[in-house]
C-alpha cells in the first residue's frame, strides 16, 4: 500500500505533468483564465488520464508487448497508433456525456474539449506508463495521480490569473507574459517537492 501512496504523491507533486514536464501547455494556458472552466477541464483530463493509462496498460501488456500474444511476435510498433486511438475514443465519449448532462461546461470548454484527444499530457502519461513498466494497479494510481496533478496546476494558475486582474501589471507583461512568469514560479515551487524521498 505504501508503494501506491508513494506513486500517487510522486505523480501529483514531484512529477507533475504540467509543471515538471510542461506537458499539455496549450489547453493549460488557454483555459486557465477562470477557475470554473479550469476545474471542469481538470476533471475531464483526470477522467481521461485515469481511464486511458490503465486501459492502454492492459492492451500493451496483453496484446502489444513482445511475446504477449504469440511467442516471438512483437507488436510494440503499434503502440502510438493504438494509444492515440484509445485516447481519442475516450475523449469522444466524454464529449458526448458533457454535451448531454453538463451543457454549460461543454460550452465553456469549447474547442479545448476535443483538443484533449491530442493533449500531450495524456499521451505522456501513457508513454511514461510503458517506459516505467507499470503493472495494472500502478497504472490506475499513476493515471489518476497525474490527472489530479494537472488539475491542481491548472486550477492554481486560474486562481492566480483571477487575482491578477486586480493587480497593477506593467503593460508589456499583461496576458501571456505574466502567465508564463506565474507558471515558471509555480514550477519552481513544485520543484521543491523533488527532494522528497518516499
UniProtKB/Swiss-Prot annotation:
Membrane topology designation: Multi-pass membrane protein
Localization per record: Cell inner membrane
InterPro entries: NqrDE/RnfAE, NqrDE/RnfAE_oxidrdctase, NqrE
Key words, A-Z: Cell inner membrane, Cell membrane, Ion transport, Membrane, NAD, Sodium, Sodium transport, Translocase, Transmembrane, Transmembrane helix, Transport, Ubiquinone
Keyword Cell inner membrane in record: yes
Coiled coil ranges: none
EC number: 7.2.1.1
Transmembrane spans: 11-31, 35-55, 77-97, 110-130, 140-160, 176-196
Gene Ontology terms for molecular function: oxidoreductase activity, acting on NAD(P)H, quinone or similar compound as acceptor
GO cellular component, one term: plasma membrane
Pfam families, sorted: Rnf-Nqr
Reactions this protein catalyses: a ubiquinone + n Na(+)(in) + NADH + H(+) = a ubiquinol + n Na(+)(out) + NAD(+)
UniProt keyword annotation of Membrane present: yes
Tree of life domain: Bacteria
Biological-process GO terms, alphabetical: respiratory electron transport chain; sodium ion transport
Record family assignment: Belongs to the NqrDE/RnfAE family.
Chain's role: NQR complex catalyzes the reduction of ubiquinone-1 to ubiquinol by two successive reactions, coupled with the transport of Na(+) ions from the cytoplasm to the periplasm. NqrA to NqrE are probably involved in the second step, the conversion of ubisemiquinone to ubiquinol.
Subunit organization: Composed of six subunits; NqrA, NqrB, NqrC, NqrD, NqrE and NqrF.
HAMAP family in alphabetical order: NqrE
Protein name: Na(+)-translocating NADH-quinone reductase subunit E
Protein source organism: Haemophilus influenzae (strain ATCC 51907 / DSM 11121 / KW20 / Rd)
